[in-house]
């Protein structure tokens, strides 16, 4: 990147927030070169020309911003939510159109700069680079910021009074926590009361934990840093996020089992667990189900009064449908059947039956709109945030989860994706139909593994607590069908490996709850400010380390995954053959360092196509992430060739984009029944322009949710380890130390840590240290290695084995494990 001052440096793609393509041509940009300094006269002259243009743009922007600055307050007052506690959103272009009739790129950029420079009121969204959307801070939060700023500036005694009281509360809370290590989590009514001044400071501390991109200044940093320094008598504060989280736990506002990501207001999850509120919502849904009369619903509370596809549903009669999932699964989206073809030995039809929420919920319903915003069900450690309410999903008559209606003598509505497969596992024909299934059989993955005598996935439990499998085999009359289905899956795997497919085997940590978490005293998940409480105990959790290979290609779980892939390929053919727009999921192959590197990688594959990550890091540059697009394309990760396509349709109860595809199929099936076709294909519910816009939104949501899931998994893994450390610190509570099946104490999982590097040496200017990123397979985590003594010019080969000691666990919104190199167990720097 070339700056207006002539400096050149590398920038992350996601940190580039605004582009004006017309400033210079691609040719002029190319002539500037990529080096930090110009290497010849051509590069120098090109850079001089670009700098002239940049400075002219800068001059125009400065003039525009001066005029806009005076309007900042009125812009905020006009756009903020009228509810002083709620966030709202606006794009830079929308603000520009409020002020200018036909805003130029310079005027839009001036708005972008003005709002970006005012984080107290305007916060750049997580995917700002893609949508230029700002979140507008609620008025209450702005007032809290302004008030605490004033108190800090004036050295108000209000802060001293709060810190004095907070220390007294923390003394009680910390002692209570230490004395209740064996207890189940619970709330204890506090004897303290927070004043209105205290509440202002606490609200500010809570709000400071909201996720914010580093591309903007953080208006909370100086304020919470001041509070932390005085509360903990620190001279300097380097990790505000971690320390403010610690403070809020120490004074009982947060519990150690609070899920910081879920309570972030930016994600708009339903945090109200009050029984009366939940019951009223459920009753409203049930009333709407009974009262909806419009065949074409228009009101946001109207469901379909009758099934839109009732006249064209294929009745599958007594055909056995197998729904295989985890024992505790709540939303059962999919089941499958096999139909042998007597006249064609080796060939068979696979029918994948998917729950059909589109038969009840129209796109206009408020539940659909809420689902569009949430994007998918959230499975957090403390609780599940379903895409649709349980009262609807499990309703005995209108229920959407497979098996609910048929259990009550009413056939389940499904969309069935059928693939005719030859003896080699190739799709030679397909069909997509609306259907009715009656013979739904729910069984668990483990019971099928036992019945078929195949290995189940092997997961590691480094902190103990491995469950003892008690699964009984699936009924014997299911076995032949289940074997046939597994044979289909094995052929798909063979096909994939023959296409030179490969994947890296990586370990990943996951924490699961063993028992339910307590409900918050006020019934609303999040900070307990108005009703002061303390807390004790810690949830019963289990720490699991799974590998990509075991979770993806071992046991009947992998068979079900292959069936879902086949149905998504069928869906793609359905849309492609009819020229109907759909959200195709694609993924390009990894980028190798050379042609020889490809051969090297392929030679390292095991029988399932996997390579241990540490063995392949030096042979590829990067793995392109999966994307959505309007046309069918390659998906290397699923071994789908260019042009075939893949459209997700198998989880409409858990993913909104699958439901979008279902609605599209509904309309196509109805139009085909009525003969409404044209030379351009069959029309769906959504046209190409709508689908294009939706795919842009879906792409943003997909990347955001992946990031959230990574942070969530890391936070809970580190929270678990932090609690483990505190429980057994200084030899305490040894009677609680887990034991193996033979009754012996398990080895200390935090001793003898080793792994491999996944980055070169990093000079972190913020903390003035040389660092490394690494993987510890035993824990399934990627910690930071600090205090690295090494020559930056020498570097470290990716995949280098490394031994480390645990230095620190930092929680907060950006949880991290910090390690240091254990030079007693390895030579450092490596030669």
Describe the predicted segments one by one.
Residues 1, 830-831:
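Eukaryotic N-terminal targeting leaders
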Residues 5-7, 15-225, 231-233, 302-790, ...:
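Electropositive polyanion-binding surfaces
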Residues 12:
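Beta-strand/loop-dominated core regions that host nucleotide or nucleotide-derived cofactor-binding catalytic loops
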Residues 233-320, 324:
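Short glycine- and acidic-rich boundary segments immediately preceding or forming the N-terminal edge
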Residues 786-807, 827-830:
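C-terminal structured domains
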Residues 809-829:
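Internal insertion modules embedded within essential enzymes
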